[in-house]
């Protein structure tokens, strides 16, 4: 009996011990898993392509502004710090997640075709020099009405408050930032700048301004003050718009005050696609979300992970499949026509998200990369490869904004309005690459049409794990390649957010050739060549891809701005 009693007591004690151990593990493990790295923020973050603009966005959040408020303030700043990329003379696309409703919306304020555009504009596509275009390529700017619509729907602070930091920046002795200086003093841009009206802004006599030179820009400061006080309508139906139109008319622009008054941003549903445990929300055509979704939908079927790419052959295999998916994607870019101007293709972009198409494409991908262009439906028409800016914001309540803005190629049309301080876009150049594969006919522009775009401001949400990735990029046709690889690196390969963005990328051009960023892994590069992947013979002068992202993982918030553009994120 004594032995049995002792056994019972031991079993009871063992059970109690196991129970306590389970309780301890249940309490300790979540805390361990939720521990944040030293570079994490705990509440909110902003990732713009410069530190000063990220900081301005952060301050707006700390003043109880909404993520949309912060994004707008950061974009206004970026139009000054990186005017070669974006500004009031361009267009913007917002993808916005409202944590209180769980709803995602897209605000599309991309530029449009003016009513009195040159009827023979597209005849100039073949000979167009994207870096020396001109007034005939100017689209109706949508930037400010895009801000106004986003602020009307989601703003919290007074409109004028969003402009004050940048007005102060201009009034207090603004100097040329290093990145702007690089663009101003790049050999392939200088001849165009020298012959343009931008001379009066960016030249000191016969020399272009250099880093830290004073950059007086009183006209833009005055414009921002007017817009802050009177609202966006002063540009679209007021005196500022009249001044802008008059300034650029003598440079060949056919933009009218009627074009400005007629512009309306579109509020639309995002494209939505399951990506493992995440849901990807991205902008529909004419933005590039359908192409980004298509690529990731194809790639997810191959189940790449950190383990599968651990060895050299695994890396080569993954990049081979990526290259092949990018080739098929380039062949689908014609689907990005504006569905409002071309209703016949309204549902074509949705086809790109279908699992049946993804499965079909996977079956077309084998171990070789030397198939004919027709295998991928490639047309050989090249898009622009630089320009644009992106801001990602995550607010304290979990709401998020991904916003991409552009004037198209560096310095846009290189047309300057001296009385408003606004640089104009050359967005109509993007109409040149919207003909179908196998056809040499490019449909004539439609007044009010928005040109196709590679912009992909995107938000990926994992409701179960409480994770969120807010991401987008710049770089023209490089955007989708760069954003795809950043997402793959982060979500599938387990990179830190900073490393996911910093990793050298590859890109597939319209001829199916692979272009490698400097410092791309040479072993992988050789492995791809062994599989028949052809390298582009004309290496681009510089890779201008730039990705900004914020990643929320439980209580941890990580933000990264691309060092390629000397960016730095900010948060708290």
UniProtKB/Swiss-Prot annotation:
Transmembrane region(s): 7-29
Subcellular location: Membrane
GO cellular component terms attached to this protein's record: plasma membrane
Tissue expression pattern: Widely expressed, but at low level, except in the airway epithelial cells. Detected in brain, heart, kidney, liver, lung, spleen, testis and trachea.
Active site: 388 (nucleophile)
Post-translational modification: Cleaved by autocatalysis into a large and a small subunit.
Binding site for L-glutamate: 110, 406, 427, 453-454
Function: Cleaves the gamma-glutamyl bond of extracellular glutathione tripeptide (gamma-Glu-Cys-Gly) and certain glutathione conjugates. Hydrolyzes glutathione releasing L-Glu and Cys-Gly dipeptide which is further metabolized to maintain extracellular cysteine levels but also to provide cysteine necessary for intracellular glutathione synthesis. Among glutathione-S-conjugates metabolizes leukotriene C4 (LTC4) and S-geranylgeranyl-glutathione (GGG), but is inactive toward gamma-glutamyl leucine. Converts extracellular LTC4 to LTD4 during acute inflammatory response.
Family that this chain belongs to: Belongs to the gamma-glutamyltransferase family.
Protein name listed in UniProt: Glutathione hydrolase 5 proenzyme
